[in-house]
């Protein structure tokens, strides 16, 4: 079997690469080890509404559970800050359908797609990487390809086999645990986030509504924590008297929240998405970043194939670092500063944010808001608090 | 440092692949089952802490 490109992993990043490369007329094979692409999922399914336009994805109700109008954050002592738009700002997807449809779009664009096909090694001939070895229903298959894309998610084995260094220490991961459950009393037009060192060390608890009374209720904590994510989520539910008698689904997973990969390409292998740790370090959302990087990668794969010059692939690393790098580094700095917040700090910030123009903040125009916060005596008197805000500027 | 063998509780494990991702030694593979390669393991215990459900534990092995 021979293709121009083999893409390993059909989550979010993989199918976008496969679709865009197939569209340009090159032969692509997209494989995933799952028997049903998209299932099981490891996600809270929240995403900004702009991605559909930006990445040319149909706004198809089959994978949109609910439209969301904003967010509400809660501090340890119960202060809240809310941001509500009059227009839809985000959606809660049905990832199981979304991922499969992304693979369908890739197939429609001309890519071949193979579920239940696990890549177990690289195919090497005379020291050169020539493709991948995979297992399909127990049968060993060799897939030859000029370019190999490692879009295999947080496990990131394919890139590591190729010698791309995607390692980062355990502190740069979040451990996540989530119930899809019946939950009442939370405004279903907003996503809800709870912060606090006792609630969710380093991370937060979330409620992402999929219906009036049905939501993804989950937690992310630092993965080097002595206790498990499940422990903290169950504790939070119990302390808040939220009944857990109607659980529809349980999801677990790890999220890379830092330690970006310097070199995204080695010879003819490129790494993208969670496998490349391309995740927003502050909120742990990775779908947007996976799509964005996939977009850049696909462009350079097409150029490299058109000009028969694989060296051009390296421009993917360069462009990603130019376009996304600075923002991601800034967010990582912010995350590291946020980790030092005490519960009292969080109370102060949420309280102050509650009284500001949060829309400006979310619109990216947070300069003024931050500057105003920095003048507040409760911030001025604390070196730590000032440091956090400085990281934002 | 003690040498360990990582053990999985299959009834707790969701096969999410997270432990394979944090393992610095590629000593875990997660496919339709959870697999451990003792010869590669460097006994760092990172996987055990990282598992979101606590599905992993260890036993000491003779060096
Ligand atoms: C609990 C939780 C909640 C989250 N919530 C959000 C959220 O609300 N919003 C958001 O934007 N992000 C969220 N994320 C992060 C988001 O899920 C990921 O960033 C995103 O899925 C990354 O896409 P990807 O294509 O890189 O990898 P994945 O979606 O993980 O896809 C990788 C694919 O590769 C396959 N694969 C792996 N190894 C092999 C192999 N050897 N051979 C063949 N196939 C292989 C896997 O089966 C998988 O389908 C969350 C993560 C978790 C764990
Ligand atoms: S992290 Fe835990 S649940 Fe996930 S595959 Fe490893 S042992 Fe299983
Ligand atoms: S103990 Fe360390 S080396 Fe061994 S499997 Fe776990 S993470 Fe890998």
UniProtKB/Swiss-Prot annotation, chain A:
Pathway: Membrane lipid metabolism; glycerophospholipid metabolism
Transmembrane segments: none
Pfam families (alphabetical): FAD_oxidored (PF12831), GGR_cat (PF22578)
SUPFAM superfamilies: FAD/NAD(P)-binding domain
Enzyme Commission number(s) from the entry: 1.3.-.-
Cofactor note: Binds 1 FAD per subunit.
Keyword match NAD: no
Keywords: FAD, Flavoprotein, Lipid biosynthesis, Lipid metabolism, Oxidoreductase, Phospholipid biosynthesis, Phospholipid metabolism
Residue sites binding a 2,3-bis-O-(geranylgeranyl)-sn-glycerol 1-phospholipid per the record: 327, 363
Cofactor(s) in the UniProt record: FAD
Binding-site positions, FAD: 13, 32, 43-44, 46, 95, 119, 274, 286
Gene Ontology cellular-component terms listed: membrane
HAMAP family referenced in this protein's UniProt entry, alphabetically: DGGGPL_reductase
Function of the protein: Is involved in the reduction of 2,3-digeranylgeranylglycerophospholipids (unsaturated archaeols) into 2,3-diphytanylglycerophospholipids (saturated archaeols) in the biosynthesis of archaeal membrane lipids. Catalyzes the formation of archaetidic acid (2,3-di-O-phytanyl-sn-glyceryl phosphate) from 2,3-di-O-geranylgeranylglyceryl phosphate (DGGGP) via the hydrogenation of each double bond of the isoprenoid chains.
Family from the record: Belongs to the geranylgeranyl reductase family. DGGGPL reductase subfamily.
Other observations noted: Reduction reaction proceeds via syn addition of hydrogen for double bonds.
Name recorded for this polypeptide: Digeranylgeranylglycerophospholipid reductase
Organism in which the protein naturally occurs: Pyrococcus furiosus (strain ATCC 43587 / DSM 3638 / JCM 8422 / Vc1)
Classification of source organism: Archaea, Methanobacteriati, Methanobacteriota, Thermococci, Thermococcales
